[in-house]
């Protein structure tokens, strides 16, 4: 299965809630100026996630089948990047250490 590009993934999530690895629900508010705008459950903006970080996560997921939910792998907003990645069909959170994985196809 081919993974989407970061901008396509993010645009498809606008207005939708996504869950982080620890179960926190956040909402994707929009995509602007190369970033995904993420809001907390009270409606306030809590992060601007670089589309480049989302794309890097997608690329690593495609190449290696998994990516760690960590700053070094997904950038400063790794938790939110991972929450977006698991919205792709066939992708889920894994345990110990926290990671995002593609299912075998």
Predicted feature locations:
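Short amphipathic alpha-helical interaction segments
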Residues: 71-87, 93-94
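Generic beta-strand structural signal
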Residues: 30-31, 93-95
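Short amphipathic alpha-helical segments that mediate assembly, nucleic-acid/protein binding
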Residues: 5-6, 54, 78
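Short, cationic-aromatic polyanion-contact patches
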Residues: 96-105
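Surface-exposed polar/charged interaction patches
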Residues: 15-16, 60, 64, 88
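Short acidic, hydrophobic short linear motifs in intrinsically disordered regions
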Residues: 48-73
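Long, low-complexity, charged/polar intrinsically disordered regions in eukaryotic proteins
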Residues: 1-47
């Amino acid at each position: 299965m081919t993974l989407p590009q970061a901008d396509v993934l993010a645009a498809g999530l606008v207005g939708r809630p996504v869950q982080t690895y620890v179960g926190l629900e956040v909402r994707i508010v929009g995509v602007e100026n190369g970033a995904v705008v993420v809001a907390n459950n009270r409606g306030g903006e809590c992060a601007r996630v670089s589309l480049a970080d989302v794309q890097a996560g997608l690329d690593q997921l495609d190449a290696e089948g998994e990516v760690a939910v960590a700053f070094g792998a997904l950038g400063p907003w790794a938790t939110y990047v991972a929450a977006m990645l698991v919205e792709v069909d066939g992708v889920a959170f894994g345990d110990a250490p926290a990671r995002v994985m593609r299912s075998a196809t």
